[in-house]
């Protein structure tokens, strides 16, 4: 198993999932571009887990994400549904019909200035109508992504970002994008707002068959499919789309891993009553149904709460972000996702999605929380033991699952990844004869330092840890959020304004936590307070009163799994 690619197929369902996915694929693409850099560690992460090789109509080799994404009409902006990599304008222009023609032209969206710069750096449109790509990596350590001939940085402005396709710099396969034409992305009418609407989409033969055809296309070319990762909006009707997609995957591909990342955008406000009630109902239905059909489910949000009461967004000591901008929030969540998914993307690891889920989800605990330190605060001259000791006994991670602060909660099992720390900093370089200031300073390898630290933090808890040299890529179009970091991602007291940060160290974790007991119970309590007669429109979308009663029972049963005291070490 360790020697093969162990392919993963990614499903992106929803518009905020598109934002997170765009940053995620940009980061994978940036990592591919560094594959031949002599400073980069080789062979830690296997890009073939996420990417597939192919050929254009003109025989040029391509390397594109193994991806199916679903979004609503009007969400693509200037991006073509079939992508641009395989398109042949000569074939588009070939018309066999000899009779009278009437031409209808749809007004094109203006292309984002950032994407215009990006495409000019990536290749040229030749006179014969064929797109000539300068260089596309093939996943085997071949040439990196082509850069522009001028040093002009390709940095989009926040004002220019309307939709996720405005900053996606990765070419997609024609089988990737699936648009739901019956609902609109913009405007107040025709929105995909409710869980029942989303379920109904994949009950329609048209969309179900389209999804199944795309699944078969990607799955049949895999040598060893380890499973599926679903990036799914929880706050709107895509929670229902995700639930039906997970159910389909469970039925069709039994035994494969299904890890679902339930995504929620930034803060919300009390004044938006209907939107908040719908968000609560969609989140609750989504969590319960996705848990039933997934190997593992993890909510991801920078918000402080899943419930009706607004809480301030989480704070990162070394980041300055705007929680109202999906472009910022999704970048941070994608960085965490790029780190916590490392275990099933390693070249040398036998860990699969199923193994990771089994370790974290014992005793029915299929919902986990995520946390991360972005960036990991290693200052110049510090060692890893020095930096870890600064955290003291507190849980170091910023919570990313809207479950409140983790202090005082119990962890039942955890998977931890620390990446981007130079090997020379892994251990303390003490002068011979100097007594080590802590047990961490006495460790002889970085892996030992990390394992010892986790044992001190959570004695007796089942922990899996990974230490990687490979950092997380945050080059443009990633937003400039790192005001306290130098170019290598090191934390500085006062970095020069505008310093270019292209990679950072990140400390990320997935945890089966007792905090979920309180979070899920609070979600159930908020639901019991609702007067459903006021929200008949949600019920009209295909949800019955009996479904609400069953939902409450399932939420409370799930919450009981996380009562403190129920763990492997008891």
From Swiss-Prot:
<keyword id="KW-0963">Cytoplasm</keyword>
<dbReference type="InterPro" id="IPR019605">
    <property type="entry name" value="Misato_II_tubulin-like"/>
</dbReference>
<dbReference type="InterPro" id="IPR029209">
    <property type="entry name" value="DML1/Misato_tubulin"/>
</dbReference>
<dbReference type="InterPro" id="IPR036525">
    <property type="entry name" value="Tubulin/FtsZ_GTPase_sf"/>
</dbReference>
<keyword id="KW-0472">Membrane</keyword>
<dbReference type="GO" id="GO:0048311">
    <property type="term" value="P:mitochondrion distribution"/>
</dbReference>
<keyword id="KW-0597">Phosphoprotein</keyword>
<protein>
    <recommendedName>
        <fullName>Protein misato homolog 1</fullName>
    </recommendedName>
</protein>
<dbReference type="GO" id="GO:0007005">
    <property type="term" value="P:mitochondrion organization"/>
</dbReference>
<dbReference type="Pfam" id="PF14881">
    <property type="entry name" value="Tubulin_3"/>
</dbReference>
<dbReference type="GO" id="GO:0005741">
    <property type="term" value="C:mitochondrial outer membrane"/>
</dbReference>
<dbReference type="InterPro" id="IPR049942">
    <property type="entry name" value="DML1/Misato"/>
</dbReference>
<feature type="modified residue" description="Phosphoserine">
    <location>
        <position position="495"/>
    </location>
</feature>
<comment type="function">
    <text>Involved in the regulation of mitochondrial distribution and morphology. Required for mitochondrial fusion and mitochondrial network formation.</text>
</comment>
<keyword id="KW-0496">Mitochondrion</keyword>
<comment type="similarity">
    <text>Belongs to the misato family.</text>
</comment>
<keyword id="KW-1000">Mitochondrion outer membrane</keyword>
<dbReference type="Pfam" id="PF10644">
    <property type="entry name" value="Misat_Tub_SegII"/>
</dbReference>
């Amino acid at each position: 198993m360790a020697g093969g690619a162990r392919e993963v197929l990614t499903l992106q369902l929803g518009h905020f999932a598109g934002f997170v996915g765009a940053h995620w694929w940009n980061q994978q693409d940036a990592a591919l571009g560094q594959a031949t850099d002599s400073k980069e560690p080789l062979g830690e992460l296997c890009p073939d887990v996420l990417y597939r090789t192919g050929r254009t109509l003109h025989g040029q080799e391509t390397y594109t994400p193994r991806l199916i994404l679903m979004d609503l009409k009007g969400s693509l902006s200037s991006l073509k549904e079939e992508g641009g990599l395989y398109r042949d304008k000569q074939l588009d222009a070939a018309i066999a019909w000899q009779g009278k023609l009437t031409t209808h032209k749809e007004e094109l969206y203006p292309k984002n200035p950032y994407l215009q710069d990006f495409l000019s750096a990536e290749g040229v449109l030749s006179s014969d109508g064929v797109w000539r790509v300068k260089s596309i990596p093939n996943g085997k350590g071949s040439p990196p992504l082509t850069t522009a001939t001028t040093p002009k940085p390709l940095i989009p402005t926040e004002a220019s970002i309307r939709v996720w396709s405005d900053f996606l710099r990765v070419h997609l396969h024609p089988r990737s994008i699936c648009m739901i034409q019956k609902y609109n992305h913009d405007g107040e009418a025709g929105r995909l707002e409710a869980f029942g609407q989303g379920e109904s989409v994949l009950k329609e033969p048209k969309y179900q068959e389209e999804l199944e055809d795309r699944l078969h296309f990607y799955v049949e070319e895999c040598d060893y499919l380890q499973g599926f990762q679903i990036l799914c909006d929880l706050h709107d009707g895509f929670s229902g789309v995700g639930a039906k997609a997970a159910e389909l995957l469970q039925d069709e591909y039994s035994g494969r891993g299904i890890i679902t990342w339930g995504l929620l955008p930034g803060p919300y406000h009390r004044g938006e009553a209907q939107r908040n009630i719908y968000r609560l109902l969609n989140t609750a239905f989504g969590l319960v149904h996705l848990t039933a059909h997934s190997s593992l489910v993890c909510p991801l949000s920078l918000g402080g709460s899943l419930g009706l009461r607004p809480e301030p967004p989480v704070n990162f000591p070394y980041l300055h972000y705007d929680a109202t901008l999906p472009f910022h929030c999704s970048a941070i969540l994608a960085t965490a996702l790029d780190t916590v998914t490392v275990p099933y993307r390693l070249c040398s690891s036998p860990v699969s999605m199923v193994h990771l889920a089994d370790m974290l989800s014992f005793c029915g605990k299929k919902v986990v929380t995520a946390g991360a330190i972005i960036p990991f605060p290693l200052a110049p001259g510090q060692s890893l033991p020095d930096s870890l000791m600064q955290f003291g006994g507190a849980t170091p991670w910023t919570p990313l699952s809207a479950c409140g602060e983790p202090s005082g909660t119990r962890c039942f099992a955890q998977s931890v990844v620390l990446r981007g720390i130079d090997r020379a900093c892994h251990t303390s370089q003490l002068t011979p004869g100097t007594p080590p200031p802590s047990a961490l300073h006495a460790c002889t390898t970085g892996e030992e330092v990390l394992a010892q630290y986790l044992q001190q933090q959570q004695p007796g808890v089942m922990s899996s840890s990974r230490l990687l040299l490979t950092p997380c890529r945050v080059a443009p179009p990633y937003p400039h959020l790192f005001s306290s970091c130098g170019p290598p991602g090191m934390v500085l007291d006062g970095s020069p304004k505008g310093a270019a940060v292209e990679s950072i160290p990140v400390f990320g974790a997935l945890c089966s936590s007792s905090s979920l007991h309180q979070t899920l119970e609070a979600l159930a309590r908020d639901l019991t307070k609702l007067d459903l007669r006021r929200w008949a429109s949600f019920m009209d979308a295909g949800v019955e009163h009996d479904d609400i009663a069953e939902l409450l029972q399932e939420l409370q049963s799930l919450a009981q799994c996380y009562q403190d005291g129920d763990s492997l070490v008891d």
